[in-house]
């Protein structure tokens, strides 16, 4: 998938790569933070010993720095986007040409996944969309009782689909 970067993005990526030695695949930013998606296996170099590279980058850019390790495996990439929050399950459903990712989390972690006014989930959709063609990420809050309650063949249980739509509707209000 081709990513369009503006001049500011290119300069920011170049500077971060020089500071850390990590290969950056993509970067996005907002008023609060800068997110760098680094090549699989480069997360250690990006963080640096004792988090030194992240601290230096935070000082240099004047914003909080988030790092995400890229993965060709979409489910692993989604887990990496939300790390360190542990996702109980991730599954993908294709609707026509659109990929929709569903993530199941413990009910207590739902707010952390979605973020204040949906910022975290919006950022995740933006990054997953740019790099993996994901159109939407839906959060399903529920406890996983056993390994067999995961939808078969990436099918979505009706109750899970309904609750994930309700979660997004609640957050958009």
Swiss-Prot record:
Record's subcellular location: Cytoplasm
Q: Where is the composition biased (Basic and acidic residues)?
A: 147-162
Stored InterPro entries: KH_dom, KH_dom-like_a/b, KH_dom_NusA-like, KH_sf_prok-type, NusA_arc, NusA_bac
Task: Enumerate the spans annotated as KH domain.
Answer: 31-97
Q: Which GO terms describe its molecular function?
A: RNA binding
Which CDD domains does UniProt cross-reference here? Answer: KH-II_NusA_arch_rpt1, KH-II_NusA_arch_rpt2
Q: Which Pfam families match?
A: KH_5
Query: Which keywords does UniProt give here?
Result: Cytoplasm, RNA-binding, Transcription, Transcription regulation, Transcription termination
Reading the lineage from the top rank, the first entry is: Archaea
Region of interest: Disordered:
147-173
What is any one of the record's Gene Ontology cellular component terms?
cytosol
* Gene Ontology annotations of biological process type: DNA-templated transcription termination; transcription antitermination
Give the Polar residues compositional bias ranges. 163-173
Query: What Gene3D superfamilies does this protein map onto?
Result: 3.30.300.20
Q: Please describe what this protein does.
A: Participates in transcription termination.
Q: What PANTHER family does UniProt report for this protein, alphabetically?
A: TRANSCRIPTION TERMINATION FACTOR NUSA (PTHR22648), TRANSCRIPTION TERMINATION_ANTITERMINATION PROTEIN NUSA (PTHR22648:SF0)
The family this protein is said to belong to: Belongs to the NusA family.
Output this protein's name: Probable transcription termination protein NusA
């Amino acid at each position: 998938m081709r990513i369009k970067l503006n001049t500011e993005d290119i300069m920011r990526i170049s500077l971060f790569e020089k500071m850390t030695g990590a290969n950056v695949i993509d970067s996005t930013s907002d008023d609060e933070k800068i997110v760098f998606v680094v090549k699989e296996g480069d997360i250690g170099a990006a963080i640096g010993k004792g988090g030194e590279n992240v601290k230096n980058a935070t000082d240099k850019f004047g914003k909080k720095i988030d790092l995400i390790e890229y993965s060709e495996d979409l489910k692993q990439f989604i887990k990496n986007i939300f790390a360190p929050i542990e996702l109980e399950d991730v599954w993908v459903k294709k609707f026509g040409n659109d990929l929709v990712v569903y993530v199941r989390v413990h009910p207590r972690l739902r707010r952390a996944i979605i973020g204040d006014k949906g910022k975290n989930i919006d950022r995740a959709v933006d990054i997953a969309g740019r790099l993996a063609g994901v159109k939407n990420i839906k959060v399903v809050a529920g406890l996983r009782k056993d390994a067999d309650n995961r939808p078969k063949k990436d099918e979505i249980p009706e109750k899970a689909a309904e609750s994930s739509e309700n979660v997004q509707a609640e957050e958009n209000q």
